[in-house]
Regions:
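A structural motif
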Residues: 59, 166, 221-222, 307, ...
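ATP-dependent carboxylate-amine ligase
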Residues: 1-12, 33-36, 42, 244, ...
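N-terminal leader/targeting and accessory segments in enzymes
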Residues: 1-85, 89, 258-263, 281, ...
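A short acidic, helix-capping loop that chelates divalent metal ions and anchors anionic groups
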Residues: 70-71, 136-141, 198-203, 372, ...
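Acidic, Mg2+-coordinating active-site environments of NTP-dependent enzymes
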Residues: 4-5, 64-70, 188-336, 411-420
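Phosphate-binding loop of NTP-binding sites
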Residues: 7-10, 83-224, 228, 232-244, ...
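Short, well-ordered alpha-helix to beta-strand connector turns
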Residues: 21, 33-34, 59, 70-71, ...
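Short loop/edge segments at beta-strand edges and connector loops
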Residues: 14, 64, 77, 131, ...
């Protein structure tokens, strides 16, 4: 691609020259002969220190925010924004050829993304997906390294989707990705807001910064679907009142769509989705109060795209579950559930939904992530103590922190509340201990890992798949019983 085409819509000063290139990167480890290297700032490494080395390797052009001292450079105001635009140009801006749906929020992004993909496929559409669990092009599964990929990988994936015949792309958009301008230049047909609770404050520092990062999605969305029951959802609706905002609620009749006559069970939730001039019955095959919000948000994303309301609500009755999201691994003689809940709000949502249907003891296994927002740990303990009969305190991803210290930071709360617990640093051992404790009609929920099949311990990623652990236990259990 000619450099001037690569730089289309990028505002810069300097002379880029006139040459062709097939690669642009902001990763110093990927610099190669003939490429364009974008020097970005972030984290512990400043790409601005690497310019001379990149030219020695063979980079044709350096894109930077300040003078690097090398001859072949251009200067931009924001290198991350420039990089995102260049990556889009390199792949011929595939986002412009697709109907783009973005989902953001603390909880519910993954479930919402899979629901929207499922609903679109029921409408006969070819759909691509990017998210925490996996990326997908139709039925093809591509492993996901990030909730939202870096600009080069993101545009490469969107290009693959388009070339494979996809008409729609459904994306989870993380707050970090939005703040880092990974999605800069991409316009969304619909943006969906699920909720906002304390998370990622190690990165954003304040809830206001966290909220502002989420709102970057809606600045670039033509239509916005908002959970009006969330306080921050009301702020989204107010901030973007000049756009087409569609609100939903299970309690506020001022919302555009409300859920009424809600009936909960251990297997599903039934409700009427009511709007001005329409009533549609929904029999949604996933349990829990939060499932009402997930179902309505997904349905309204399609309705915002112009699909028939009745057709969409009918399709909601036939959607499939998502791996690691309130996923039932064992149904009898006891119940074992796997869920990704890793925030206090996520834990409260899933535990409060399951608790009413537990016939025996409710046993909760969870841990708190290391090197992440430590203030939320005690809030997670509060949520668990409110619902559990017995708790297994274990490790999540300790990373470089001492896992025992993480456990010790919350164990005192269970002592104070007189909630019995076992503390076990080794998550595999903790899971097996919890499984061996189960009696008839008990329910065990494994919280925090969900779809993940690994742990990060001291900077090393080790294999740990809770699905496999439970399967091996049940294979032995069934042989002996």
């Amino acid at each position: 691609m000619n450099i001037h085409r690569l730089l289309q819509n990028v505002k810069y000063t300097g002379n880029p020259g006139d040459f062709d290139t097939d690669f642009v990167t902001d990763d110093s480890r990927k610099v190669r002969a003939g490429c364009v290297f974008v020097r970005s700032k972030g984290g512990s490494f400043d790409g601005h220190t690497f310019a001379e080395k990149a030219v020695e390797i063979g980079a044709k052009l350096i894109v930077a925010e300040r003078d690097t001292g090398v001859e072949n450079q251009i200067l931009v105001e924001n290198s991350r924004q420039a990089y995102a635009l260049m990556c889009g140009n390199l792949f011929d801006n595939p986002a412009k050829k697709l109907k783009m749906i973005g989902i953001t929020g603390t909880n519910g992004k993954t479930t919402s993304a899979f629901l929207i993909k499922d609903l679109l496929q029921q409408m006969g559409k070819q759909v691509g997906l990017m998210g925490t669990v996996q990326n997908m092009i139709g039925s093809q599964i591509i492993p996901a390294k990030f909730t939202t990929p870096q600009p080069y990988e993101l545009n490469a994936l969107l290009s693959q989707m388009y070339k494979s015949g996809c008409e729609y792309a459904v994306m989870e958009t993380s707050s970090q990705a939005l703040a880092q301008n990974r999605l800069y230049g991409i316009k969304f047909d619909v943006g969906v807001f699920t909720n906002l609770t304390q998370d990622h404050l190690d990165y954003h520092k304040t809830m206001e910064n966290y909220f502002d990062a989420k709102c970057l999605l809606f600045q670039n969305s033509e239509k916005i679907v908002v959970n009006y029951d969330d306080p921050y959802g009301k702020k989204v609706a107010e901030r973007f009142k000049d756009k087409e905002v569609i609100t939903f609620s299970d309690r506020d009749n001022t919302a555009d769509y409300t859920a009424r006559n809600i009936e909960y069970s251990s297997k599903n939730v039934k409700f009427l989705m009511v709007a001005k001039g329409s009533i549609n019955r929904v029999d949604f095959p996933m349990p829990g109060e939060y499932s009402v919000h997930n179902a309505m948000g997904a349905a309204l994303a399609l309705i915002a795209l112009g699909f028939d309301e009745t057709d969409v609500c009918t399709a909601l009755n036939h959607v499939h579950g998502v791996k690691g999201r309130c996923e039932i691994l064992v149904k009898e003689p006891f119940t074992v559930i796997c869920d990704y809940a890793h925030t206090d709000d996520g834990l409260k949502n899933v535990l409060s939904s399951i608790r009413p249907f537990v016939k025996g003891r409710f046993i909760v296994l969870f841990g708190c992530a290391g090197e992440r927002d430590s203030a939320k740990r005690i809030l997670m303990a509060h949520a668990v103590a409110d619902y559990a009969d017995y708790v297994f305190l274990t490790s999540d991803n300790p990373r470089g922190e001492n896992p025992q210290s993480i456990i010790d930071s919350v164990s005192g709360y269970f002592d104070e509340k007189k909630v019995p617990y076992t503390a076990e640093v080794d998550r595999r051992k903790a899971i097996n201990s919890a499984l061996n404790m189960l009696q008839y009609n008990d329910t065990l929920i494994l919280c925090g890992k969900g779809h993940e099949d690994y742990q990060v311990l001291n900077g090393i990623t080790v294999y740990l798949d809770e699905h496999d652990i439970v399967k091996k236990f049940m294979d032995n259990y069934n042989k002996e019983n």
